[in-house]
Amino acid sequence: MLRSRQATNALRAVGQTRPLRSQTAVAFTQSLNKVPSNRRSEATVATASSTASGAFNSQVRPTPSPTFNQYDSKVQPLTGMSRNVTDESFIGKTGGEIFHDMMLRQGVKHIFGYPGGAILPVFDAIYNSTHFDFILPRHEQGAGHMAEGYARASGKPGVVLVTSGPGATNIVTPMQDALLDGTPMVVFCGQVPTTSIGSDAFQEADIVGISRPCTKWNVMVKNIAELPRRINEAFQIATTGRPGPVLVDLPKDVTAGILRRAIPTDAAIPSLPSASIQDAMDLNHKQLEASIARVAKLVNMAKQPVIYAGQGVIQSESGPELLKKLSDLASIPVTTTLQGLGGFDELDYKSLHMLGMHGSAYANMAMQEADLIIALGGRFDDRVTLNVSKFAPGARAAAAENRGGIVQFEIMPKNINKVVEATEAIVGDVGANLRLLLPHVESRSTDDRSAWYTKIDAWKKKWPLSDYQKTERHGLIKPQTLIEELSNLCADRKEKTYITTGVGQHQMWTAQHFRWRHPRTMITSGGLGTMGYGLPAAIGAKVAQPDALVVDIDGDASFNMTLTELSTAAQFNIGVKVIVLNNEEQGMVTQWQNLFYEDRYAHTHQANPDFIKIADAMGIQGQRVADPTKIKESLQWLIDTDGPALLEVITDKKVPVLPMVPGGCGLHEFIVFNPEDEKTRRGLMRERTCGLHG
């Protein structure tokens, strides 16, 4: 039977979610043409399924379908099982009132957003609701980043509610940020009435088209009867597989209209069961078991293994706990990505801290010399691999000799072999697959790997992260020193301390010099690198964790982009603590201009406002510190102050973030701090800028 790829994908998705119903349907399904599968490279890919426990029940299926975790813009998501049960509870309610009730059913406690004409029916319905809190930012971008911070700190999806046109387009940056960083977020935006769509009506924007590349899924609700189903789908898709943002477009006539009839409790979609599905699931499980066995063999054989842990570990249930079990059992050192910080206790002897462009030198060396790299929930981002042709030569050589290689545990099939070719690939939830792997891993002590740890210890001694210019020039504060002091002050409360950052040098210094011990405590923009992320994300994190200490460590340039959200913190008494490292420049860009553009500082210096006066004008307490001897005292004031507070720190200028791997280089070709090199660098800077800088 001939059919389109769209129909094929839909039938396969439905088949995966339906129990066997009739022999007629089975025979019909078996007559369908088989869809050719894409061939991958030498990596063996096995899909983790609900059979992780070793048993398969044909009457139980994962919800939503595994197809939801695969991106196909031509296939609408299929959720729920078709039933004849209807729900009469929404009859007589407006679309806005249905929205309110659906938020309650989804367990939503907080919403971030900004009102406008096209979304007023919803705002009217939630007016004075006692069931959840509404946080009103000063800009829709702030609402999006607040929702991201909320989601990152809580593990629950952040919810955004904005109007049409500019209200919707202002949320695009947070959605793209959430997509790249795997943050669950559900965005509801108003839209002009369906009768006006396409007429260039006031504040009309094709937000479904605009947001298609920056969401996991989006939809316009075209009639009130489908509103509950679409809301359910949105929350399911945002939180399953690799989390991400979804968008639901709500025309005004839908939210203002009244439902006149009962609606199905779930999506009423046709069912087409397939007898081949159980066979396929059994085959996948057998392939998974075989792949796990091969991975265990590589782990047991490896002499110099290293675990590279990404955010997938943190997002997986019990991921950090299982990571620790694997590391302890086989005595394998662990390095983490920027977004994986906190997934492994950095006070553990086996910790290598962060890897990558600004990672520790010893983590980068371990990645280059390891004979086996176990990648857990990491996608081999370019800031991790740098020059791919020079990446992991030790593991590649071991793979060629069948004694090691690169093992990738990844939830998204499309990320397998996307950047780096994997020797073995395990597709599925990291935690579920680690549970399958652990029983097959042989115990090893650090003494059994003494040669490997001797190398690592030598690298740690030669290139410690604490190696930077601590002598303050002209009595100026070093940012690294301040962050280390903050880490020390929070040493006994790390589990309840959440740090957010903007993007720039301060972000990397925070990653390097704060000691991370618990998951979800580092909240930053990694994939998109969104300046201005820190303050609104901190507000969202504090809303999610009201009893925790939430500190935004920001740079002056990044802070300038969203500082108006201080007013939000003041209005709602959200007790975030803000540290602004003020060097009056766009530090990360000036670092590149210094190293690679002969100190031509093109438009990277700005005149800042008086941050303390701004804080005072917005009703927030503020202090400024410029004396290195007052760092501890000032930080203690910030921590102890009730409500939101701001500490401006006047820091040294032109301080580089080191270690650093220049673009185009291998991980082992890093620049580290050297006192003589620092003197030469500053002297050359003064010469090139006629004494203006340096």
Swiss-Prot record:
Q: Which cofactor does it need?
A: Mg(2+); thiamine diphosphate
Keyword Mitochondrion in record:
yes
- Quote the InterPro entries the UniProt record gives: Acetolactate_synth_lsu, AHAS_TPP, DHS-like_NAD/FAD-binding_dom, THDP-binding, Thiamin_PyroP_enz_cen_dom, Thiamin_PyroP_enz_TPP-bd_dom, TPP-bd_CS, TPP_enz
Cite the cofactor comment.
Binds 1 Mg(2+) ion per subunit.
Give compartment(s).
Mitochondrion
**UniProt-listed SUPFAM superfamilies:** DHS-like NAD/FAD-binding domain (SSF52467), Thiamin diphosphate-binding fold (THDP-binding) (SSF52518)
Question: What would be one Gene Ontology cellular-component term for the protein?
Answer: acetolactate synthase complex
For the ligand (Mg(2+)), the binding residues are 556, 583, 585
Residues reported in the UniProt entry to bind thiamine diphosphate: 140
Q: Pfam families per the record?
A: TPP_enzyme_C, TPP_enzyme_M, TPP_enzyme_N
- List residues binding FAD: 242, 358-379, 410-429
Domain of life (superkingdom): Eukaryota
A Gene Ontology molecular function term for this protein is:
acetolactate synthase activity
Q: Where is this region: Disordered?
A: 45-69
Family classification: Belongs to the TPP enzyme family.
Could you describe the subunit structure of this protein? Answer: Homodimer.
Designated name of the protein: Acetolactate synthase catalytic subunit, mitochondrial
The species this protein was found in: Aspergillus candidus
**Chain's gene name:** cfoL
